[in-house]
């Protein structure tokens, strides 16, 4: 049975026809520069608890997180206190996946912007159960897996090291090889990420929790999808008669690219009648698989600043005059038009290598037009704030 005290807060989440209590469900929220501890405590005391506060580990030290952030559930707090070195990796991973999110959405109206001095990191935009929230939960979970697995292989953590199962001989399409080197222990990264990240969602049984759990799993599995076999050849003149191989994670960009494609193909769902799973909102679409991102609510258009939706708007954003894609001025500026400014850029050019060990370049100036989206009319902006 779904938790009744979390009903009716989010009219945008639909449920399949059925019993009356399977109505609407609430939504969940989720880097900032270093700030003093008293301010952090005041900030946290005034912030709703329903968020992914662990995202803020990228901005604060592990000790402060463990002791003072109320958004962590007991299991997360226990893991944080027991494995402070892993929390350090989680913090570094948070910075990495946020950068990747911003790279993937750099040409979109919503550009994965973060809020300074806000431990929810993304603000109210994560309250809506949108495809943007689906992407953020997936890539954040993937980021934890990636960061912990990498730290294991680099010998930075007490609890793990290289994959202990990759020993002896094995075979691939090229023939037999010996396991050697240091295979990335991705299964440990997945297990810890699941235990830590999913802990909060498992405390409740509502629609948003199920959505988050599903998308968290998509993110974890995305990292594993891009494990690659790397080998070193042995033999006369490197003839590769013998090979030593190990499993290594690919660059995190591949995971980001993959999840971006999943974002574009995300499937809108509604809760089934007994509240234990999903069904597609539109019967003309296929059912979601374990590798699909799912969401409940349509996204706002992100055209104008809307504090209630967490939208910063697109006024002042740089756009591409000739593009017909999401970075094009027509799409990015939502039909409001754009301003053009001529600017002079200084770049390095005519670079030459000088013996030994120096590259010398000239500085060249060129003039380019920069197009930025116009602000909405005052009345239009006031309607959204």
Curated annotation (Swiss-Prot):
Disulfide bond keyword on record: yes
PROSITE patterns, sorted: WNT1
GO biological process entries: camera-type eye photoreceptor cell differentiation; canonical Wnt signaling pathway; cell fate commitment; cell population proliferation; cornea development in camera-type eye; embryonic camera-type eye formation; embryonic forelimb morphogenesis; iris morphogenesis
Modification note: Palmitoleoylation is required for efficient binding to frizzled receptors. Depalmitoleoylation leads to Wnt signaling pathway inhibition.
GO cellular component: extracellular space
Pfam families xrefs: wnt
Distribution of this protein across tissues and organs: Detected at the marginal tip of the developing retina. Expressed in the intermediate and the lateral plate mesoderm in the presumptive chick forelimb region. Expressed in the eye, head ectoderm, prospective forelimb mesenchyme, lung bud, pharyngeal arches, the brain and otic vesicle.
Keywords, sorted A to Z: Developmental protein, Disulfide bond, Extracellular matrix, Glycoprotein, Lipoprotein, Secreted, Signal, Wnt signaling pathway
Xref: InterPro entries: Wnt, Wnt2, Wnt_C, Wnt_CS
Domain of life: Eukaryota
Localization, UniProt: Secreted, Extracellular space, Extracellular matrix; Secreted
Main location: secreted
GO molecular function: cytokine activity; frizzled binding
Lipidation (O-palmitoleoyl serine): 237
Covalent S-S links between cysteines: 101-112, 152-160, 162-182, 231-245, 233-240, 303-334, 319-329, 333-373, 349-364, 351-361, 356-357
Signal peptide positions on this chain: 1-20
Gene3D superfamilies: 3.30.2460.20
Glycosylated sites: 111
Entry keyword annotation includes Transport: no
Family: Belongs to the Wnt family.
Function: Ligand for members of the frizzled family of seven transmembrane receptors. Functions in the canonical Wnt/beta-catenin signaling pathway. Acts as an upstream regulator of FGF10 in the lateral plate mesoderm during limb initiation in the embryo.
Assembly information from the UniProt record: Interacts with FZD4 and FZD5.
Protein name: Protein Wnt-2b
